[in-house]
């Protein structure tokens, strides 16, 4: 381990690969709530967080598990379509809570164009949340709807049905033909929009 008068031990969360403090400081200086997006292999989570000297406060949050529980999502929760739907959900939740704008915080996730973290952003923006962005970073619409997944499933089924059933077993167990994923995406998206727009009309 390095040592000497000029050596500084990095903060613990930086050592653990959890926080980029330089980037965090820039986000805090904006003074806006942060749209915090995090992902794992099987799920995405989105939160609207504001800085507080005593500790960050979460104003609203959404998890891809809610897509399954509340809106009947049958697809995988770690893919691009589910990420977009999560963004739509957090965007509507934020608007309902009176939050009009935020700044994106993807933590240590690499800012890769078209990645699922930017699908979350796209969904939030489509819900009406004002987040500074460049449209070029969004995934293509066909990827947001899961058309690439449906096409791959179709090809795999024709070439190797056993492998198809292994890879898409989770879809099939829930009664979803992966070739119908784009249509299923449209149905779940419509349910999210209907829920929040009908609630807004009643208010």
UniProtKB/Swiss-Prot annotation:
Family classification: Belongs to the universal ribosomal protein uL18 family.
Q: From the Swiss-Prot or TrEMBL record, what is one GO molecular function term?
A: 5S rRNA binding
Descriptive protein name: Large ribosomal subunit protein uL18
- Keyword RNA-binding present in the record's keywords: the answer is yes
Q: Which PANTHER family match?
A: LARGE RIBOSOMAL SUBUNIT PROTEIN UL18, RIBOSOMAL PROTEIN L5-RELATED
List cystine links.
Answer: none
Annotated GO biological processes are: ribosomal large subunit assembly; translation
Please give an example of a GO cellular component term from this record.
Answer: cytosolic large ribosomal subunit
Q: What keywords are annotated for this sequence in UniProt?
A: Ribonucleoprotein, Ribosomal protein, RNA-binding, rRNA-binding
InterPro entries linked to this entry? Rbsml_uL18_euk
On assembly, the entry states:
Part of the 50S ribosomal subunit. Contacts the 5S and 23S rRNAs.
**What role does this protein play?**
This is one of the proteins that bind and probably mediate the attachment of the 5S RNA into the large ribosomal subunit, where it forms part of the central protuberance.
